């Protein structure tokens, strides 16, 4: 029984010491990986920020290039009376004489093309 204890005790001490060393190594590896991951995340974050800033600059340039006159003026929707001489129907609509309804109100309405 003593020989079993004598052989078991050094094996146990060796296993504990190696296990502790492995635990410390694992902890160090995890810290290194975490630091590498943080640096990678910082790099990715900076890259994404640069791309977003470039996109924002492009969008602001496009907005500043448009003038107020380039916007579509107010238009008349479908089925709304319009003036034959000055039709302000929205895009995709045409100022036409109605076929059935509206004959007695105004002579022209905005209809789809």
Curated annotation (Swiss-Prot):
Protein's UniProt keywords contain Cell division: no
Tissue specificity as recorded in UniProt:
Expressed by the venom gland.
Intrachain S-S bonds = 75-90, 82-95, 89-110
**Which parts of this protein are propeptide?**
22-74
- What family name appears in the similarity comment? Belongs to the neurotoxin 14 (magi-1) family. 01 (HNTX-16) subfamily.
Protein name per Swiss-Prot or TrEMBL = U11-theraphotoxin-Hhn1a
What the entry says about domains is: The presence of a 'disulfide through disulfide knot' structurally defines this protein as a knottin.
Q: Entry's InterPro entries?
A: Toxin_22
Q: Which UniProt keywords are listed? A: Disulfide bond, Ion channel impairing toxin, Knottin, Secreted, Signal, Toxin
**Pfam family name, one:** Toxin_22
* Span list, region Disordered: 61-83
As one GO molecular function, the record gives:
toxin activity
Leader sequence residues:
1-21
Q: Which parts form a coiled-coil structure per UniProt?
A: none
Q: Where does it live in the cell? A: Secreted
Say where the protein is mainly found: secreted
A GO cellular component annotation in the UniProt record: extracellular region
């Amino acid at each position: 029984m003593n020989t079993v204890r004598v052989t078991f005790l050094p094996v146990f001490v060796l296993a504990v010491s190696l296990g502790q060393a492995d635990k410390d190594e694992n902890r160090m590896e995890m810290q290194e990986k975490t630091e590498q991951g943080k640096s990678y995340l910082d790099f990715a974050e900076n890259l994404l920020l640069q791309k977003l800033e470039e996109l924002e600059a492009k969008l602001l340039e496009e907005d500043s290039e448009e003038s107020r006159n380039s916007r579509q003026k107010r238009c008349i929707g479908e089925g709304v009376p319009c003036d034959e001489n000055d039709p302000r129907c929205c895009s995709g609509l045409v100022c036409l004489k109605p076929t059935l309804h509206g004959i007695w109100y105004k002579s022209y309405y905005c209809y789809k093309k």
